[in-house]
Design a protein with these regions (language model features):
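Extracellular/periplasmic, surface-exposed regions of secreted and cell-surface proteins
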Residues: 78, 125, 155, 226, ...
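Hydrophobic alpha-helical segments with strong N-terminal bias
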Residues: 100, 115, 146, 241, ...
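Intrinsically disordered, low-complexity regulatory segments
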Residues: 340-343
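Short, small/polar-rich motifs associated with maturation and membrane association
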Residues: 1-303, 308-312, 317, 325, ...
Length: 617
C-alpha cells in the first residue's frame, strides 16, 4: 500500500494493470478501482462516519465515546414546512428539549427548555454558542433571543448538551443546558458551485371561536329584553350590520424565503462559502410582518501541510418587524357583531365605530366623547391606529485557529477570537383616535445595542498507548466581556384645564420618560480542563473542571471574595456493545451504562453591579 501526497497524488509499483485497488480516507467511503496509468479516484463523504463526530464543549468527540448526555442534530434537507428561525428546526427533534412559541407572531421568539427549568428567579434559557462564540441572554429590539438572528439555511448542525456532567465545562452559564451551533463551510477541492433554494408558503387560521352572527345577536337581544322596561334602549343600541370581527382582523398570509449559496475552493488550500438570505414572514393577524436579510461568509484554509486549520466565520443580519397588538384578538370575540367597522360621526376615532361615553374630563368642545372604558374596543381600530415597529442589525463573527504542533502531532493548540455586536430600535406610535389612546395619542421609542467579545484558548493532547489505552487531556483559558446600552422615551398628552387655553398650548405632557438610559457591563474569566480515558474501547472515565471569575459578584476590599465559582464533573461509562455477548448482535447498535455527576452554576439572575449600594437622585 501507499499514501498520497498533499495534492492527492500517489504511485504504486509492481502492480498489474486491472488489479483491484482500494482507496480510503477518514470520513469518506472506500472506493475500489482497477489499476491503470493515471487513474483518477473521487471519494464520496461517508455520512454515517461523519455523523458520529459530535461537537462538545471546547472540542469534538466520536459519538460512541461520549460519556455525558449530548444530542446531535443535522437539519432536515427536505422542506418540513415554514422554517423562519433556528428554533423551528429544534422543535420536536431532540428528546428532553421543549420549544414553545411565544404567541406565534412573525419572527417571534420561543421558550426553549432543556430538561425543564432549573431556577425560580433567574433565567432558564440555555446557553447558545455559535461557531465558538457564546451569546448573552439579552437580545436586541426585534430579536429577544440569539436564535432568531441566524439564517436556518446556514446551519450545519446542532449539538445539545443536556446533563450536568456535559454542561459543567461551561460553568456558571451551563445550568440550563447548552446549544452549540456550527455553520456550514466550504469543502476542500470542491469546484465552484451556486445553489438556490426558496419557498413560498400560505398560512391561514384553521378555525375561530364560535360566536353569534349579527342576526343571531339581534334575535337574542329581542327575546332577552321582551317586555322589559329597558327593551327600547337595548334595541336602540343594536346596529344593522353583520360583522364577523374575527374575519376582520385575520387574513390569509403569504410568506417567502430565498437563499443563494456560493461555495467552492481556491486550489486545495482555501475552501469558501458565501450565502445570501431573505425572509418575508407575513402574520395572519393583520399588520404583523417580519423581514430578515442575512449574509454569511466562511473561509477555512488549511496551511503547513494541514497542521494549521483556520476557520473564519462572519454572519450579518438586518431585521424589520411590525407588531400587531394582541388585544385585538380578545376584543374581536367580544365586540358587538351588529355594528359596522366604520361609521359616520366617529371622525375623532379615525372613523372607526366605538362605544362612547360623555367626556367629563377633557372639557374640549371639539372632543365631547371618549371611548367607554367598560366596553370592548373596536379590534380593527386597535390594529390600524397603532404603528409598532422595530429595526435590528447584528454581526456575529469568529476567527478560529487550530494548530497541530510540528514534530509533536499529538498536541493541538486552539485559539478562538470572536464577537457578537448588535443593536435595534423600536418605535411605538398610537394615533389620537385609537381606542388604546387617551385623547391625543402617544409616541415613544426604545433602543439598545450590545458589544460582546470573547477570547478562548486551549491545548489538547491525544495519546494512545498500545491498542488498549487512550488518553485525551485538555486545558484552557477564556475571557469574555459583555456590554450593553439601552435608552427609551415615551410621551403622552392631555388637555391642560377645564377651559380651552390659547392656541398652541392645548395639550399638556402628562407622562414623560425623558430618554435617560443606562449602560452596563460584566466580565467573565475562566480556567477549564477535561480528561478522558478509554480502556479497550469499553470502559470510559471523564473528569472536567471549570473555575469562573465573574465581575457580577462581590470583590470589594474587606469583603469575602465571592467572585470565583468552581464547577467539577465526573462520569464513568461501560459500553456493553463492546463485550463479547453483544459484539456480534445486529439488533443492538449501541448500549452503554453511564454514571455521572456534575455541578453547574447560574449568574443570569444577578445584576452587574448588585453588590454596590444604590442611590436614587
Amino acid at each position: 500500500g501507499t499514501t498520497t501526497d498533499f495534492d492527492g497524488n500517489f504511485t504504486l509499483s509492481n502492480v498489474k494493470q486491472g488489479a483491484k485497488l482500494q482507496v480510503s480516507y477518514v470520513g469518506s467511503q472506500t472506493q475500489e478501482v482497477a489499476a491503470a496509468p493515471n487513474v483518477q479516484v473521487v471519494l464520496q463523504d461517508n455520512s454515517q462516519v461523519l455523523n458520529e463526530v459530535v461537537v462538545i464543549g471546547y472540542g469534538v468527540a466520536k459519538k460512541k465515546d461520549l460519556t455525558g448526555s449530548v444530542a446531535a442534530l443535522k437539519p432536515d434537507t427536505k422542506n418540513k414546512g415554514v422554517v423562519v428561525s433556528a428554533q423551528d428546526m429544534l422543535a420536536g427533534k431532540i428528546a428532553g428539549v421543549a420549544v414553545t412559541s411565544e404567541g406565534g407572531t412573525p419572527g417571534g421568539s420561543a421558550t426553549i427548555r432543556i430538561r425543564g427549568g432549573s431556577s425560580l428567579n433567574a433565567s432558564n434559557d440555555p446557553l447558545i454558542v455559535v461557531d465558538g462564540v457564546p451569546l448573552d441572554h439579552n437580545g436586541i429590539k426585534g430579536f429577544p433571543n440569539g436564535l432568531g438572528m441566524i439564517n436556518p439555511q446556514d446551519i450545519e448542525s446542532f449539538n445539545v448538551l443536556k446533563d450536568a456532567s456535559a454542561c459543567a465545562i461551561y460553568g456558571s452559564r451551563g445550568s440550563n443546558g447548552v446549544i452549540i451551533i456550527t455553520t456550514k463551510k466550504g469543502k476542500r477541492g470542491q469546484k465552484p458551485s451556486i445553489s438556490y433554494n426558496g419557498s413560498v408558503t400560505m398560512s391561514a387560521k384553521k378555525k375561530t371561536i364560535d360566536v353569534m352572527t349579527g342576526d343571531e345577536y339581534r334575535d337574542y337581544i329581542k327575546k332577552a329584553f321582551a317586555g322589559n322596561e329597558r327593551e327600547a334602549d337595548a334595541l336602540a343600541a343594536l346596529g344593522n350590520a353583520n360583522t364577523d370581527w374575527q374575519d376582520e382582523i385575520y387574513r390569509t398570509a403569504w410568506s417567502q424565503d430565498h437563499n443563494v449559496q456560493l461555495s467552492g475552493s481556491v486550489g486545495k488550500i482555501l475552501p469558501y462559502r458565501v450565502s445570501l438570505g431573505y425572509t418575508d414572514n407575513q402574520g395572519i393577524l393583520k399588520t404583523s410582518d417580519f423581514k430578515r436579510y442575512t449574509v454569511g461568509v466562511n473561509l477555512n484554509p488549511s496551511l503547513f501541510d494541514d497542521h494549521l486549520v483556520i476557520n473564519l466565520n462572519a454572519n450579518w443580519m438586518w431585521g424589520r418587524n411590525h407588531y400587531a397588538d394582541g388585544a385585538a384578538i380578545n376584543n374581536a370575540v367580544r365586540f358587538d357583531p351588529t355594528q359596522p367597522v366604520m361609521a359616520e360621526g366617529f371622525e375623532n376615532f379615525g372613523g372607526y365605530f366605538e362605544w362612547l361615553s360623555s367626556n367629563s374630563d377633557m372639557k374640549d368642545a371639539n372632543w365631547p366623547t371618549i371611548t367607554n372604558t367598560n366596553a370592548p374596543r373596536n379590534p380593527v381600530a386597535i390594529l390600524m391606529l397603532k404603528n409598532d415597529r422595530a429595526r435590528s442589525h447584528n454581526f456575529t463573527g469568529s476567527a478560529d485557529f487550530d494548530y497541530k504542533v510540528h514534530g509533536f502531532e499529538d498536541l493541538r493548540l486552539h485559539l478562538t477570537i470572536g464577537g457578537d455586536f448588535g443593536g435595534g430600535k423600536q418605535n411605538t406610535d398610537v394615533d389620537n383616535g385609537s381606542p388604546l389612546s387617551s385623547y391625543w395619542g402617544s409616541f415613544g421609542w426604545a433602543d439598545g445595542c450590545k458589544e460582546n467579545r470573547t477570547l478562548s484558548m486551549y491545548a489538547q493532547y491525544y495519546k494512545d498507548f498500545t491498542d488498549k489505552h487512550h488518553f485525551d487531556i485538555m486545558a484552557g483559558y477564556e475571557w469574555q466581556h459583555f456590554w450593553r446600552k439601552e435608552n427609551s422615551e415615551y410621551r403622552k398628552y392631555y388637555p391642560t384645564n377645564s377651559s380651552l387655553p390659547t392656541a398652541g398650548q392645548e395639550h399638556q405632557l402628562i407622562l414623560k420618560n425623558d430618554g435617560k438610559g443606562f449602560r452596563t457591563e460584566n466580565y467573565l474569566v475562566s480556567f477549564f480542563g477535561r480528561m478522558n480515558y478509554i480502556y479497550d474501547n469499553k470502559y470510559y472515565l471523564t473528569f472536567t473542571m471549570r473555575a469562573d471569575g465573574s465581575s457580577r459578584f462581590n470583590w470589594l476590599p474587606g469583603a469575602k471574595n465571592q467572585q470565583w465559582g468552581y464547577f467539577p464533573s465526573a462520569v464513568a461509562a461501560w459500553s456493553l456493545k463492546g463485550e463479547d455477548f453483544l459484539k456480534d448482535n445486529t439488533t443492538v447498535s449501541e448500549m452503554k451504562l453511564r454514571l455521572g455527576w456534575g455541578q453547574t452554576g447560574q449568574q443570569e439572575g444577578v445584576a452587574d453591579y448588585g453588590y454596590f449600594a444604590n442611590y436614587s437622585m
